[in-house]
Design a protein with these regions (language model features):
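Bacterial N-terminal signal peptides that target proteins for export
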Residues: 1-8
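Hydrophobic h-region of N-terminal signal peptides that target proteins for export
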Residues: 11-20
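Metal-dependent amide/peptide-bond hydrolase catalytic core
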Residues: 20, 197-207, 211-459, 465, ...
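Acidic/His- and Gly-rich active-site-bordering loop/insert found
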Residues: 23-129, 148-157, 335
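Solvent-exposed, acidic/flexible segments
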Residues: 23-31, 42-53, 78, 131-134, ...
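Sec-exported extracytoplasmic/periplasmic mature domains
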Residues: 35-42, 57-66, 143-150, 180-183, ...
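Solvent-exposed loop/turn segments at secondary-structure junctions
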Residues: 42-45, 76-78, 89-92, 102-106, ...
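Acidic/histidine-rich catalytic neighborhood of metal-dependent amide-processing enzymes
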Residues: 125-126, 132-210
Length: 474
C-alpha cells in the first residue's frame, strides 16, 4: 500500500513538474506567430490587414479548424480585412468573444534603431512595431486557440476570435463593422480585449494587474487659420501660421479641469499604497476633499497620472503654406483629445474654442467614420462600466494569483481608447486585460523602438492560455 501511495505521489509530482516546465518553457509557435505578424506591415498608409488576417487564418486551418469556422471578411476596402475564427464548445454557455486589432500606427525606419517591421530580439527584448500595441495580444490569442484545438479541449462555450482593422484610425473599423454587418458571427455573452489593461512592472517585476473598468472617449479636431496670403517679400500684420501657432500655444499651457470618478478614485487609492512615500503623499492629498491643487500639479507632471486626472488634448499634426516664397493662405493642425467619462466630443469642442480664443479660426470635429470634418461633434459620452462577471473575476484571480502571487488586480480607466467602445455600444459588455508585463517607465505604444521583454511575452502566452481554459471549464 505504501509503495502504491508513493508511486501515486510520484506521478502527481511528475505531472505538476511537467506542467510547470511546459508553462515556463518558451512557446516556439507563439513566438513564430508573433514574428510573422510583426513582419507584415499593417500600418494605415501602406499596410494591409487582409494579408495578416489571411496568415492567421492559414495557421488556424493548418491546426485543424474547420473552414466554416475561419473566415476573412472585408468591407469596402479590400486591404482592411478582418479574421473571425471560432473554437467550438459544448454550448453550455453563450460564447465569449476575444477582440484584437491587426493594424498598427505608422513607423519610420529613420526614427528607429532597428527596422520597425523586422522582428528583432536584442538584449532580452523583442523590437518591432506592434510589440506592445498589440500584435503580442493577437499572436497570444491565436496560439492559445491552436493549443486548445490540438489538445482536443472542448470549452463549455464557443470561443470566438476577431482580429480586425482600423482600430488605430481610418474609416473601416473592423469591430464596428462586424457588429453592424456580421453580428451572427461575433455574437457573444461578453467580450475580452487584450488591448486594454496591463500587468505593470518595475524592472521586469510585476507590481499591479490592471483590469479595464471604463475608458476615455477618442476625438480628433481640426483647427484651421486662413489668410489672403501674398508675396513673402511683403509680410502682412496677420499670418495664418502665426495665428495657428498662437492658438496651439494657448492649448499647450491649458490643463483641463481635474476630475475623479469612482474607477479612477479606486485606482488612486491602490496606487497610494504602492508608490514611494513622496508620491503616495501627493496621491492621498489629491484624494482629499477638497483636493490639494499643488499635489494635483505635481502628479500631473507624470503623463500616466495626468491622463488619469483629466481630459487631455494635444496637437498631433501640422500642415501649412503652399510655397516657400509665398505668405501662407492656410495653416491647419489636428488636435487629438481623450475625453473623461461624463463629457462629450461636442462639449470639448466648445472648450477648445474658448481656449484658442480666436473667432477667426475654424474649429471642427473630425468624423472618424468618414475622416471628414464636421462643424459640431456628437453628444455621445463614454459608456458606463460593464457589470462585474463573477466567473471572469474568479478565473483572473486564480490564474494571476498563481503566476504573480501577491500582485493585486486593480480596476482602471483606460486613458486611451479601445474597440471595447464598439462592443459596448452594441450591447455587449467588454473587459480589458492583458497578461504581458510592461515596465511603467518603458511604455512605448506608438513610439520609436517599441519593444517588449522576451520574458514578459512568454509569461503572457502562458497566462492567456490558462485563463481561457479556466474561464471555459478547463
Amino acid at each position: 500500500m505504501a509503495s502504491k501511495t508513493a508511486a501515486l505521489g510520484c506521478l502527481l509530482l511528475c505531472a505538476l513538474a511537467a506542467r510547470a516546465a511546459a508553462d515556463t518553457a518558451p512557446d516556439a509557435l507563439a513566438r513564430d506567430i508573433f514574428k510573422q505578424l510583426i513582419e507584415i506591415n499593417t500600418s494605415h498608409s501602406v499596410g494591409d490587414t487582409t494579408v495578416a488576417a489571411q496568415a492567421m487564418a492559414k495557421r488556424l486551418l493548418d491546426a485543424g479548424f474547420a473552414a466554416a469556422d475561419v473566415q476573412v471578411l472585408t468591407g469596402r476596402n479590400p486591404k482592411r480585412g478582418n479574421l473571425v475564427a471560432r473554437l467550438r464548445g459544448s454550448g453550455a454557455h453563450k460564447p465569449v468573444l476575444i477582440i484584437g486589432h491587426l493594424d498598427v500606427v505608422e513607423a519610420r525606419r529613420e526614427d528607429w534603431s532597428t527596422d520597425p517591421f523586422v522582428f528583432t530580439e536584442k538584449d532580452g527584448y523583442f523590437y518591432g512595431r506592434g510589440t506592445q500595441d498589440m500584435k503580442d495580444g493577437d499572436a497570444i490569442a491565436v496560439a492559445a486557440l491552436i493549443r486548445m484545438k490540438k489538445e482536443g479541449f472542448v470549452p463549455d462555450r464557443d470561443v470566438i476570435l476577431a482580429l480586425t482593422a482600423d482600430e488605430e484610425g481610418g474609416t473601416d473599423n473592423g469591430v464596428d463593422w462586424l457588429m453592424k454587418n456580421h453580428r451572427d458571427l461575433v455574437d457573444a455573452e461578453f467580450a475580452l480585449n487584450p488591448d486594454s489593461g496591463a500587468v505593470w512592472s518595475d524592472n521586469g517585476k510585476p507590481v499591479a494587474f490592471d483590469l479595464e473598468a471604463t475608458e476615455k472617449l477618442y476625438a480628433d479636431y481640426e483647427i484651421t487659420a486662413t489668410n489672403p496670403g501674398g508675396h513673402s517679400s511683403l509680410p502682412r500684420a496677420d499670418n495664418a501660421i502665426y495665428e495657428l501657432a498662437a492658438a496651439l500655444g494657448r492649448l499647450e499651457k491649458y490643463p483641463f479641469p481635474f476630475e475623479l470618478n469612482p474607477v479612477t478614485r479606486a485606482w488612486l487609492e491602490h496606487m497610494a499604497a504602492a508608490e514611494p512615500a513622496a508620491r503616495a503623499r501627493d496621491i492621498k492629498a489629491v484624494l482629499r476633499s477638497p483636493a490639494s491643487a499643488a499635489a494635483v500639479a505635481r502628479l500631473s507632471q507624470d503623463p500616466r497620472y495626468n491622463s488619469t486626472l483629466r481630459t487631455t488634448c494635444v496637437a498631433t499634426r501640422l500642415d501649412g503654406g503652399h510655397a516657400n516664397n509665398a505668405l501662407p493662405q492656410r495653416a491647419s493642425a489636428v488636435v487629438n483629445c481623450r475625453i473623461l467619462p461624463g463629457h462629450s466630443p461636442e462639449e470639448v469642442r466648445l472648450d477648445l474654442a474658448k481656449i484658442f480664443a480666436d473667432p477667426k479660426l475654424q474649429l471642427q470635429w473630425i468624423d472618424t467614420a468618414t475622416d471628414q470634418p464636421r462643424d459640431s461633434g456628437p453628444a455621445t459620452k463614454a459608456m458606463p462600466p460593464p457589470p462585474p462577471r463573477p466567473e471572469l473575476l474568479a478565473a483572473l484571480h486564480k490564474v494571476a494569483g498563481e503566476m504573480w502571487p501577491g500582485v493585486p488586480i486593480v480596476s482602471e480607466m483606460e486613458t486611451g481608447a479601445s474597440d471595447c467602445f464598439y462592443t459596448m455600444a452594441a450591447g455587449m459588455p467588454c473587459y480589458g486585460f492583458s497578461g504581458t508585463a510592461i515596465d511603467r517607465d518603458d511604455v512605448r505604444f506608438h513610439g520609436r523602438d517599441e519593444r517588449l521583454r522576451v520574458s514578459a511575452y512568454d509569461q503572457g502566452v502562458v497566462f492567456y492560455y490558462r485563463l481561457l481554459k479556466t474561464l471555459t471549464g478547463g
